[in-house]
């Protein structure tokens, strides 16, 4: 089991243009290294576009956010369009997270011989930091990611763990939790579900 402290800062325009477009732009300290990431919704709830830029160790100081680091990638182009549509409004820190992550690779027996990374995240999401409106929400989630093999191995492992440990499936990201905190929403309005499409 590998233990890592993850401290992330999430950026958006003041009117939350990126969130409205299903995008997240963050700087995250992973141990001693900084990584800038942009994510966007994909074709379905299980598919996300993502691009990471390793910024290395910066002597403890947080580097400045720079959307240009993602230029020339599909999600970077989408980010550039969203920012241009906002009139190139400045990016501001909207929320942050402080998480301890425990990771382990699990080999799933059976057809396909899948290897799944299990990541247990425990910590908090904070919105309005340093203001009278500061609020936080606890995080305790288990993320499963297929590293190689058949997706059925991942589904089988998720089903087994949900049955044995009372877990439930959620597509709500830490960034979305922060957006809900900013809006003072416990839950979002219900939407009609669509049949999932698996790759």
Please provide the spans of the model-predicted regions.
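Phosphate-end processing signature that detects enzymes handling 5′-triphosphorylated RNA
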Residues: 1-199
């Amino acid at each position: 089991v590998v233990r890592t402290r993850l401290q992330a800062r999430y950026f958006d325009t003041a009117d939350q243009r990126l969130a409205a477009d299903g995008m997240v732009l963050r700087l995250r300290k992973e141990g001693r290294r900084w990584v800038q990431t942009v994510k966007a919704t994909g074709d379905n709830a299980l598919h996300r576009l993502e691009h990471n830029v390793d910024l290395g160790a910066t002597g403890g100081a947080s580097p400045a956010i720079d959307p240009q680091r993602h230029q020339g990638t599909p999600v970077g182009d989408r980010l550039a369009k969203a920012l241009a549509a906002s009139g190139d409004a400045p990016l501001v820190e909207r929320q942050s997270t402080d998480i301890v992550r425990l990771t382990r690779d699990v080999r799933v027996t059976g057809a396909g011989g899948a290897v799944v990374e299990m990541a247990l995240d425990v910590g908090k999401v904070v919105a309005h930091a340093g203001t009278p409106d500061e609020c936080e929400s606890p995080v305790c989630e288990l993320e499963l990611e297929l590293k190689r093999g058949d997706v059925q191995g991942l589904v089988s492992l998720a089903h087994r763990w949900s049955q044995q440990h009372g877990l439930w499936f959620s597509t709500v990201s830490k960034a979305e939790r922060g957006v809900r905190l900013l809006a003072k929403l416990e839950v979002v309005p219900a939407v009609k579900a669509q049949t999932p499409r698996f790759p």
